[in-house]
Amino acid sequence: MTDFEQRSIISGVGQSAIGRRLGRSGLDLTIDAALAAIADAGLAVADIDGLATYPGAGAAMPGFSGPGSPDVQDALRLRLNWHSGGLEGPAQLQAVVNAVLAVGAGLARHVLVYRTVTEATEQGRGGRQGIGLGGGGGGVPRMGGSMQWTIPFRAYSAANWLAMNAQRHFHEFGTTPEQLAMIAINARRNAALNPKAIYRDPMTLEDYFASRIVTTPFRLFDCDAPVDGSTAVIVSAAEHAPAVDHPVARVEAVGTALRGRPSWDQFDDMTTMGARDAAAALWTRTDLKPADVDVVELYDGFSFLSMCWLEALGFCGVGESGPFIEGGHRIALDGELPLNTHGGQLSAGRLHGFGFIHEAVLQLRGEAGDRQVASGPEVAAVANGGGPVAGALLLSRL
């Protein structure tokens, strides 16, 4: 099958420093990541004619939004034929999907795509306390959007909302806390091999259960770690592929569908949510099957989300992710389906979806160092998002 996706490759990847409260601006971190990705792709700054980001500065959430595309365009003095940024779409991957669409349409040859967060610094300042609150004219702020149905009930966080989904999964399918723990323990085991990871100390099952409950059934280690950092990728037209001395990742397919009710707490299937629709759409756009995938980098803003994606993408049956990951053997680096090989957001840090893309490309190129999957992966699946917000990406080594 040949679709618009397969006209695109990921020719380069780059990251800034990643850490807790680095004290650097989002733009500063973005430029570091961008220049690294451009160099990795064998390009010059002048070759970049497209720019995409998520969510863009317009989201106006301190630490979360990152610099907008006009800021980066100005800082790098780019001459753009196309640019994009926005919050509403198939999760964080929408920036990559938009870039692939632009390349497929001939609007750009080389698109710089980036995601930048300074959440660790801003949370230390109390900078995200107002997220979801409307108003702004003084007095008592008013809730807006979907949060008007959650904040009055003191459900301030996605942890609260997604815990309900996890509880439903536990109830419907007999999923256990011991099974859920394997996502966090596997992530930490892989992070120990990643020099950029935030948390690298070993974690046992006893350590996991000793951590405090955040919102049942999620414990502290089920929740990802806020960080400061930026990740950039270069989406290039395959016909204009730069000459590089490493393999590149071809974009095989994207999954962007949303067919259920766009609600965190009123979705028609509370156990899979938007992952169900995005994953189903992904497999209609490729001749590849789940059995062809060698490594998976699945969103783990909360550990349960990786389980949702395993089911939605067809790596196990609906309701069977608990037994599938039990003991952690199948999802280990040397298992049948290595999962979140860099440590995921649980241990490597919340780079808000883009860390998974970066890691998938490194694995396909055989450049992941001590955490490299020994079998030499040829196909990787990447998934972002939770609740009604979801996007999936299939990459192959070219």
Regions found by a protein language model. Name each.
Residues M1-A91, N98, A102, N165, ...:
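Conserved active-site "lid/cap" helical segment
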Residues A59-P67, W264-F267, D300-P323, G335, ...:
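Short glycine/threonine-rich loop-to-helix capping motif typified by GTGT followed
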Residues M1-L27, A36, M182, I213-D277, ...:
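Condensing-enzyme catalytic core mediating Claisen C-C bond formation in acyl metabolism
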Residues V45-P55, W82-L87, V111-T116, Q179-I185, ...:
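Beta-strand segments within the central parallel beta-sheet cores of soluble alpha/beta enzyme folds
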Residues L87-V117, A159-L193, V233-E239, A348-A368:
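Active-site-proximal alpha-helical scaffold in enzymes
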Residues T2-I9, G58-T150, R154-W161, Y199-C223, ...:
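Conserved catalytic cysteine-centered active-site region
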Residues Q15-A17, P55-A59, E88-Q92, R115-T121, ...:
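Acidic, glycine-rich active-site loops and adjacent beta-strand->loop/helix elements
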Residues D269-R276, A280-S303, M307, A312-F315, ...:
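Extended C-terminal subregions enriched in glycine
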